[in-house]
Amino acid sequence: MEDYEEDLYGVEDDFQNQFAAELEVLAELEGTRDQAPPGTLQTPASRPPLTFEEAIAGGDTVPRPCPAGSPGNVNRNTRKNVRRDQPAPSSPMVKRPRLDVVKKLNFEPDMEELLYPDSPPGDITPPPSPEVFPEMLDAGYSDANADKDLMQTLPSPRNRNPVLRRPPILEDYINVTSTSGERAFLVLRADLIGPGVQNPLLDVHWRGCGQLDLLGVPFASLKEQVDSKRRQQLLEDAQQLSDTLHSLRSEGEEAVLEGPPAEEPAPGQNTAQHCLWVDEFAPQHYTELLSDDFTNRCLLKWLKLWDLVVFGRERPARKPRPGVETTRVGKEATAPGKWKSHEQALEEMLEAELDPSQRPRQKVALLCGPPGLGKTTLAHVVARHAGYCVVEMNASDDRSPEAFRTRIEAATQMESVLGVGGRPNCLVIDEIDGAPTAAINVLLGILNRKGPQEADQGGTAVAAGGRRRRAEGGLLTRPIICICNDQFTPSLRQLKQQALLLHVPPTLPSRLVQRLQEISLQHGMRSDPGALVALCEKTDNDIRACINTLQFLYGRGRRELSVKAVQTTHVGLKDQRKGLFSVWQEVFQLPRTQRRIVGQDLMLPAHALLLSNGDKGSLTLASQRFYHILRVTTSAGEHEKVVQGLFDNFLRLRLRDSSLSTVCCALDWLAFDDLLEQAAHRGQSFQLLCYLPFVPAAFHVLFASSHVPRITFPSSQQEAQTRMSQTRNHIQTLVSGMAPTTRSRATPQALVLDTLCLLLDVLAPKLRPVSTQLYSAHEKQQLSCLVGTMLAYSLTYHQERTPDGQYLYKLEPNVEEVCRFPELPARKPLTYQAKQLIAREIEMEKMRRAEALAWARSGPQVDQGSSGPASLWTDSGEKGTRQPAPRNHEQRLEHIMKRATVQEQPERDFFGRVVIRKVAVPSREVEAPQKDADEWRMGVAVGRSEVWFRFNEGVSNAVRRSLYIRDLL
């Protein structure tokens, strides 16, 4: 027997070594490690132990009986059979447990089948010890019955003790040490009642025995929702029928028969399904407004300035505050040139005196700001608070000028100016930035109408002014409040000059979170402040978007708002177009970090974020910023202006790269942008335009910092285009005035690159400031060449008067702007006397050349026989030599008559033949005296002479004589 045990000693050790890790894990999971030593296993009395030969014959497999109809108990029976059927090997040595093998095992498939309906997946809390269930170990129980009893008698997960003596393997836990030094481990589980982030594992519902429900909501809940909708529909139909019956009754019968409604919905009957929460929780009083207090007070003060005209109440005198006034006077005395803030300017405008018609100086108030901040609600509440009946119109609907005029006059003049309850009207024009310029001009015309007091002060006739006012309309005596989203719309430029401009700032997050929490509590929706803050950040503090998002989530059946629900919900986002300065601000400035950055490599270069594909964890925040800037620039729309602003401002930032590699990378991105635009517009490849918004996103990654950038509006491109157009105009003017001989050799490109730079030196000779009669022959020749050069290039000096009253001579056209850079030092200019002398000589030379040209043109006519001022003919009529012109005293009428030659043209017929008329011989009785030939010749000569006299009735200066410039020089 001893020999037999010695032979089996090694085999038992091999068996123990082979299954040591599995036995250790099973002992730990079944809770039997505390009752038995590590090397032994307890066998129930109902089943005899197997012999060693049976164990060897069975090998590693263990018989696993499984009853029919219960396939889910295969794994559980496996563990039971291992524990019950395998014999306990007797080993004199206790083996060391292999913990590293335990860590590598995956028990999730086995443990997920033991989950309870209320336990989350992955819960592997050890079950109670087998000692709690002694009846299961009796011999009369089979394996299937034992499994059924075990499932029936296991305690619920909520009743299990969460305090463990050993750390769990597949659950999160925290360790706690008592005062006595004992350490315990607490299992972390989700809180199903308290607020917080909702665990998606808790939404898994169980159905039957261990089967998951395929629906996200239990069938019972769905049935309740359907029943509630049907009940609500019946209530709506009943209410609609009741309203129809009441509308058919007369007013007297309705007053008599009026009683309680037939059926009223319960107080918690989802009234939000009939109306929007935005309308339900809209502020009704001044104290309920969420907008800025200063803006609210300014608008209310401006409305109170109309009290004298509208209500007939005098403006209350403001009580002086001695401390504040003395301090303000002292500040103004010490710093008279200090710029006033926007608040101070608004206060002074509101404290200013009224106009002669007892109206405020600004006849209209303009509220501007992003959508969703409550501008329209602010106008309604403040107007009602001031005692007005609000009349609202949308400028985007009534776009025609006539409709715009009709609506405005109907609200202020044509109809009764008293609204509901005898209150005067206050006109609120919403979305006025969508109105065309013609409609804005109509509004300006109504605002600029003057009263009789203003007409008397202006000195105009009262009767004519009154007739004109009756034709155009009466004086505006009601306040008008305009609302816009973009104050920089071109159509609002003239209106802003006459309006009280009030910019509505974003709502404070604390106020908005408090209001949202009140709305959630009133509707029974649980929400923690963190989720509400995340909602405000997602919607940019848009009141309307926040409330609509809450109502949407509430309508979808969600009764608890969590941060995850806010982040995964795409409702509440709006396609808001930001201004250019807002886009540039977000590109060049990092957002505020509300928590410490984890996993961000601060030593990583900026351009590596665009080019590398390294660790995704370190680029999480950078990628989020990248996509945010990409979305902002895409919604901006004005890509060319955005890129031009980036180009003008990125070199003014604080660069962190001493090697300027980021600057080179930015220039490469700008070149890439130019190539994309060129390919898109020239090659009609418009699909490439989708890559343009990546340029601002790349600039954000390269140059964004926590410092506030000083951004200026881009003007370099506009200045360059203006200078280019001016240069082209100067060159075109210069070329058009050149002489043909000079123009043939001077092209615009040659003038700009070669000629004009040297021409400026030629036009600035050294001339003495004396009379030209004192010049030497060389100086006269130099002056003559200068005048000839300037005339050849169509250059001259023109006298201009400066704003301070001085006179200057400037070169016209100013070619100095074309070829001289502003940074270069200017050449020594000519004196005022030298420029004046050159300008006089240029004008004299122009007159000489014009006279010579006219004389040259009249030369051929003189040769042909026309009488000119310098043409003399011999008495015989033949062309002779040209003689000097006679003197004035020799030019008499008789001499002109002798020189004049009368040539009569013969009469011709239609075909050009000379007509010969027969002269009838008159009788001696009727023969008239013949006209004197000398008198006839004198009349013809006077008509062709250089001096003639013509009588014009009522005019005495009828003597004319041709006078040439050469006669005066």
From Swiss-Prot:
It holds the Pfam family AAA. It comes from the Eukaryota. Residues 30-97, 250-269, 318-340, 856-889 are annotated as: Disordered. It is found in: Nucleus. The modification Phosphothreonine is found at residue 51. Residues 257-268 have a biased composition (Low complexity). Its main location: nucleus. The modification Phosphoserine is found at residue 221. Gene3D superfamilies: 1.10.8.60, P-loop containing nucleotide triphosphate hydrolases. Keywords: ATP-binding, Cell cycle, DNA replication, DNA-binding, Nucleotide-binding, Nucleus, Phosphoprotein. The keyword Phosphoprotein applies. ATP binds at residues 369-376. Residues 876-889 have a biased composition (Basic and acidic residues). InterPro entries: AAA+_ATPase, ATPase_AAA_core, CTF18-RFC_complex, P-loop_NTPase, RFC_lid. Belongs to the activator 1 small subunits family. CTF18 subfamily. GO terms for biological process: chromosome segregation; DNA replication; germ cell development; male meiotic nuclear division; negative regulation of chromosome segregation; positive regulation of DNA-directed DNA polymerase activity; reciprocal meiotic recombination. CDD domains: AAA, HLD_clamp_RFC. Chromosome cohesion factor involved in sister chromatid cohesion and fidelity of chromosome transmission. Component of one of the cell nuclear antigen loader complexes, CTF18-replication factor C (CTF18-RFC), which consists of CTF18, CTF8, DCC1, RFC2, RFC3, RFC4 and RFC5. The CTF18-RFC complex binds to single-stranded and primed DNAs and has weak ATPase activity that is stimulated by the presence of primed DNA, replication protein A (RPA) and by proliferating cell nuclear antigen (PCNA). The CTF18-RFC complex catalyzes the ATP-dependent loading of PCNA onto primed and gapped DNA. GO terms for molecular function: ATP binding; ATP hydrolysis activity; DNA binding. One of its GO terms (cellular component) is Ctf18 RFC-like complex. This is Chromosome transmission fidelity protein 18 homolog. Coiled coil: none annotated. Component of the CTF18-RFC complex, which consists of CTF18, CTF8, DCC1, RFC2, RFC3, RFC4 and RFC5. During assembly of the CTF18-RFC complex, CTF18 may first assemble into a subcomplex with RFC2, RFC3, RFC4 and RFC5. CTF18 then interacts directly with CTF8, which in turn interacts with DCC1. The CTF18-RFC complex associates with PCNA and with DNA polymerase POLH. The CTF18-RFC complex does not interact with the Rad9/Rad1/Hus1 complex. CTF18 interacts with SMC1A and RAD21. Interacts with DDX11.
